[in-house]
């Protein structure tokens, strides 16, 4: 979707990815299939580019050092977002409020964390987990005794009593200008985003200003360029920070049809130094629904519905829990 947006602005995309079944490569001018740590391949790739960005935050940071001057956003955003502990401490330092947490490197650490923070809670790997992967729910202190703590560093997070979830998505230009899209209210099923709905509830609307203030501070502190997403829990005490994504985000896919300028186009505009586009919502009601796994087989049935816009990503295998596409439904409200 980003490559398509770039092409509409007259740019030719060159995709670098270790996997041969690259969906983005099918809509791009060039494709390099090579491991992340192949320095020669990465150097050749960089020689063909004026600017380099990413759409997946688990890209290894170390191999990017030789091409840092081409990167937007700066790789410090990746370094921060790739480690849940580092991310939470960073946000706390800016005045944000995350769930209660503690680093866990052993069974003893986990027992101490559960004793201090309480249960229920979630044990998460500090790196590489997304869409509910690398997570273990702990309902009681006794559950913690039965969990084999992974060899990789983990973090324990206390349960947050929340009414709903929402995202703050912004775009920041090279000149420091920041624009926000309206915040969608998000529903997750099994740790995977199911729907993003606008307008959000009154509770979300009340908490968006404080959440935006934090997101703007994060972008400023990182010297960020491009689209940045912060996810929040809406609670009785105010917005609680969940996690950040230094990239275009699934909860912003609705902007393709539902906003004056999509998150994908504005990301390209930002990293290329172009003026940012209008982020206003252009429909009275917007609902983005993810198409997960085998549901993709019946996805075309939605095309008979007024206001439905289908996006299938072209992924070859429909696995359980895999995002195969999305449909955005636009209404007058």
Task: Tell me the role of every PLM-derived stretch.
Residues 209-230, 235-236, 246-294:
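Active-site "cap" helix and flanking loop/linker of ATP-utilizing ligase/carboxylase catalytic domains
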Residues 134-230, 234-236:
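Internal nucleotide-binding/catalytic subdomain
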Residues 1-89, 93, 108:
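ATP-binding N-terminal substructure of ATP-dependent carboxylate-amine bond-forming enzymes
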């Amino acid at each position: 979707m980003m490559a398509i947006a770039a092409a509409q602005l007259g740019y030719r995309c060159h995709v670098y990815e270790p996997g041969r079944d690259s969906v983005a490569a099918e809509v791009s001018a060039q494709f390099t299939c090579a491991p992340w740590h192949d320095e020669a391949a990465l150097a050749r790739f960089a020689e063909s580019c004026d600017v380099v960005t990413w759409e997946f935050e688990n890209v290894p940071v170390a191999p990017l050092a030789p091409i840092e001057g081409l990167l937007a956003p700066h790789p410090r955003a990746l370094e921060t977002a790739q480690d849940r502990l580092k991310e939470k401490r960073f946000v706390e330092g800016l005045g944000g409020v995350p769930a209660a947490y503690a680093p866990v490197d052993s069974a003893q650490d986990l027992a101490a964390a559960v004793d201090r923070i309480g249960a229920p809670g979630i044990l998460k790997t500090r790196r590489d987990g997304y869409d509910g992967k690398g997570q273990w729910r702990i309902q009681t202190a006794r559950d913690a005794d039965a969990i084999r703590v992974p060899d990789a560093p983990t973090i324990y997070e206390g349960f947050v009593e929340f009414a709903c979830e929402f995202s703050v998505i912004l775009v920041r230009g090279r000149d420091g200008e920041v624009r926000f899209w309206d915040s969608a209210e998000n529903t997750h099923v099994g740790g995977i985003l199911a729907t993003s709905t606008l307008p959000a509830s009154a509770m979300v609307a009340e908490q968006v200003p404080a959440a935006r203030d934090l997101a703007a501070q994060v972008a400023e502190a990182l010297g960020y360029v491009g689209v940045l997403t912060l996810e929040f829990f809406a609670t009785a005490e105010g917005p609680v920070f969940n996690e950040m994504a230094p990239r275009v985000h699934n909860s912003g896919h609705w902007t393709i049809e539902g906003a004056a300028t999509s998150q994908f186009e504005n990301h390209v505009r930002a990293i290329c130094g172009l003026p940012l586009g209008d982020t206003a919502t252009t429909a009275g009601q917007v609902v983005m629904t993810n198409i997960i796994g085998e549901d993709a087989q019946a996805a075309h049935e939605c095309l008979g519905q007024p206001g439905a816009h289908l996006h299938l990503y072209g992924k070859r295998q429909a696995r359980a829990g895999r995002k195969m596409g999305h449909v955005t439904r636009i209404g007058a409200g």
